[in-house]
């Protein structure tokens, strides 16, 4: 019926109004499939089919792609291994498309074995990814390989170059093969009836060859001729490693080599294909189908060296987004930095990355497990994800599920929940200080623990302490310790007053305290060594200091000079009673907390670079402090009188000038008064410095002063090294001296 003309066979004639359909038909027919198209000379619609001899052609991939191959080879050098994921994912996609065609009734053939094969030939230096999917016609090779796949790769590289952070480098697709290959071949046969096999090849430049192939069965082989620079990908163990990393949960069976067994004392191959993946991991199954052992087994498959998890959450939602997964609560250790990057992100069972920052809330990165969602955009930068509405919805859903699970566990068995609290605390604290929605839910399951090992919700604890621990301003003061052993004397002093003391020794507790002070009404947190026990909760009933102003001034300079070291020291006086210690060391709550927080933010040295400061509180009612004054008064009487004789006239003259110029604008103050005032300031400062130095020297050489200061430091666990050794030697000398008397 047909006739040959213009290198194609006219099978039938018909009318067609669209002149462009002829050119389209020519391209389609070259694929080996008959199609109607318009012939412009005959002004008729013709049904044509090219013969196999007409399929052979050489071509150029694209005039704008001269530089894409060197970019692919070099720009992503550190990520060459992703090529295997991209190619195997394509094979899986081709296989799943055949399933879809079969379900729709478009494919009536026998699907047969769907297994994707990975074949390694070290002698030929080739790696082959072979599938039994839908295959391609020549026209489809032209469309998907030379146009769509190329366009996708170019777009990917442009985005990667600009953003520098494409999630998992996901989406480079077929052209990732050229990262590791000198030449890539495609041998394919389409599922369509009457289709011809096609062979496409390219040597890493814009030129390609398209010809009739020899494949006799449906599907596609992608053959990579591995370059010398990438010889590692000809090693069996390396390919096994990549399949385990990227393909272990893909939805179509993947075979790499044969299973092995031990026979006659050596490992030999069997005839059974070595399937490297689990096509139905637990997150793709319904929770009702699974047992606790299934979740435990899966966890240890992901993290072979990890301890048993505390519990898990099974995620499964299909509206308004698709998300599945299983998240586990691990037993978190003190250093949470090493706990990150344990959540694996998948897209339709294809591994993308284990760095999920920007995809889930930051605190959730401490969890372990898998999340799988085709709705998370992967070919964008992480910074873009922060504003993506779908990602926000997914993050909100996961946060809600986590909070729901914690609430459920707390209400179901509080005793068991409390037993797990120490392992949960770091995660929950991190969530409370970094995620507002999680904090809002935390009142349902967050706990406070005191030094007696008892647990309280926030509401319970406030009811416990507000009666005794409310200060004169009406603030409820929560007392806490970060080191019950090192701060033992302070803890016991607080307990003796009837106060309760919380244990806040977590890595993030310094951050949590500030956060809670903002959230909880009229609430302050004070560490037990932040002040004397009488002033930790200031009720306005402190006793007046019995020492004279002169005595306080002298002892302040003596003790500050003697205690001066790497830390700034200030001295004050309180009436603590004769049975209390002669001196205690306290640390300003705000400054000490800032230093603690600095340990978590070493890149911001604002407070970390400032010297630590301590307050030495001298108990003015203690006999030893009174004795210190008497000794100082006697030992420094000459210096005191001399200093007073020098300072008094200077200070009186300065006071007279200040009185005389009070209220006078600076520009109108007589020049001689300005000059004399500056001279007096300098003279007074010099006299005071000379006095301080003498008083400091006295304090450093006075046994009683040194012993009282060191006892205070020792009670706060601050006496170490050489200073501790001096204290021990001095104590021994005091005991020996007392015995000799």
Residue ranges with predicted function:
Residues 48-234, 241, 248, 261-264, ...:
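GHKL (Bergerat-fold) ATPase N-terminal catalytic module, capturing the glycine-rich phosphate-binding loop
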Residues 166, 184-207, 227-231, 237-741:
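GHKL/Bergerat-fold ATPase module in large chromosome/replication-associated machines
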């Amino acid at each position: 019926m047909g006739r040959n003309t213009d290198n194609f066979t006219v099978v039938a004639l018909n009318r067609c109004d669209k002149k462009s359909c002829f050119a389209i038909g020519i391209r389609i027919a070259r694929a080996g499939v008959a199609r109607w198209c318009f012939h412009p000379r005959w002004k008729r619609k013709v049904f044509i089919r090219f013969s196999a001899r007409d399929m052979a052609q050489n071509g150029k991939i694209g005039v704008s792609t001269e530089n894409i191959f060197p970019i692919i080879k070099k720009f992503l050098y550190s990520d060459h291994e992703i090529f295997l994921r991209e190619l195997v994912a394509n094979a899986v996609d081709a296989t799943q498309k055949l399933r879809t065609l079969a379900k729709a009734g478009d494919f009536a053939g026998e699907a047969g074995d769907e297994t994707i094969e990975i074949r390694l030939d070290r002698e030929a230096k080739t790696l082959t990814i072979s599938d039994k999917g839908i295959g391609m016609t020549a026209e489809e090779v032209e469309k998907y390989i030379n146009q769509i796949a190329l366009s996708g790769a170019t777009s990917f590289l442009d985005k990667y170059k600009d953003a520098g952070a494409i999630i998992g480098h996901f989406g480079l697709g077929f052209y990732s093969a050229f990262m590791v290959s000198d030449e890539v071949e495609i041998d394919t046969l389409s599922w369509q009836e009457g289709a011809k096999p096609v062979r496409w090849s390219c040597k890493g430049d814009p030129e390609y060859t398209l010809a009739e192939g020899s494949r006799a069965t449906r599907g596609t082989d992608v053959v990579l001729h591995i370059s010398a620079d990438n010889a590692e990908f000809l090693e069996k163990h390396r390919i096994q490693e990549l399949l385990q990393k990227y393909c272990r949960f893909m939805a179509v069976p993947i075979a790499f080599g044969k299973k092995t067994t031990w026979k006659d004392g050596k490992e030999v191959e069997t005839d059974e294909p070595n399937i490297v993946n689990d096509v139905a991991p637990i997150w793709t199954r319904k929770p009702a189908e699974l047992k606790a052992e299934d979740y435990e087994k899966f966890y240890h498959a992901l993290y072979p060296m990890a301890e048993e998890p505390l519990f898990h959450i099974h995620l499964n939602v299909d509206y308004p987004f698709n998300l599945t997964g299983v998240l586990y609560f691990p037993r978190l250790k003190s250093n949470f930095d090493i706990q990150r990057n344990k959540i694996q992100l998948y897209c339709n069972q294809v591994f993308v990355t284990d760095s999920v920052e920007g995809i889930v809330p930051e605190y959730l990165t401490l969890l372990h497990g898998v999340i799988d969602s085709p709705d998370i955009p992967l070919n964008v930068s992480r910074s873009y994800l922060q504003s993506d509405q779908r990602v926000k919805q997914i993050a909100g859903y996961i946060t809600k599920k986590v909070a729901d699970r914690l609430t459920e566990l707390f209400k179901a068995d509080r005793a068991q929940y409390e037993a797990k609290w120490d392992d949960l605390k770091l995660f929950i604290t991190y969530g409370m200080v970094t995620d507002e929605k999680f904090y809002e839910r935390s009142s349902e399951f967050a706990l406070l623990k005191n030094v007696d090992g008892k647990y309280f919700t926030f509401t319970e604890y406030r009811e416990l302490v507000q009666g005794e621990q409310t200060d004169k301003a009406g603030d409820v003061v929560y007392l806490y310790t970060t080191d019950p052993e090192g701060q033992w004397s302070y803890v016991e002093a607080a307990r003796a007053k009837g106060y309760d003391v919380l244990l806040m020794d977590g890595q993030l507790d310094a951050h949590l305290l500030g956060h809670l002070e903002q959230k909880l009404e009229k609430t302050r947190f004070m560490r037990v060594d932040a002040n004397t026990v009488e002033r930790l909760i200031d009720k306005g009933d402190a006793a007046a200091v019995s020492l004279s102003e002169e005595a306080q001034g002298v002892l302040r300079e003596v003790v500050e000079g003697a205690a001066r070291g790497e830390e700034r020291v200030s001295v004050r006086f309180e009436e603590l009673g004769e049975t209390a210690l002669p001196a205690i060391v306290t640390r300003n709550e705000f400054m000490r907390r800032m230093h603690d927080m600095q340990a978590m933010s070493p890149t911001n040295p604002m407070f970390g670079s400032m010297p630590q400061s301590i307050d030495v509180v001298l108990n003015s009612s203690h006999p030893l402090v009174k004795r210190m004054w008497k000794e100082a008064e006697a030992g420094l009487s000459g210096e005191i009188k001399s200093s007073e004789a020098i300072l008094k006239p200077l200070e009186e003259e300065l006071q007279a000038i200040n009185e005389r110029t009070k209220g006078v604008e600076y520009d109108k103050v007589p020049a001689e008064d300005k000059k004399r005032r500056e001279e007096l300031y300098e003279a007074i400062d010099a006299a005071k410095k000379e006095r301080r130095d003498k008083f400091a020297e006295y304090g450093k050489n006075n046994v009683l002063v040194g012993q009282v200061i060191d006892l205070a430091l020792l009670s706060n666990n601050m006496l170490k090294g050489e200073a501790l050794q001096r204290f021990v030697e001095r104590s021994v000398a005091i005991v020996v001296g007392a015995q000799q008397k």
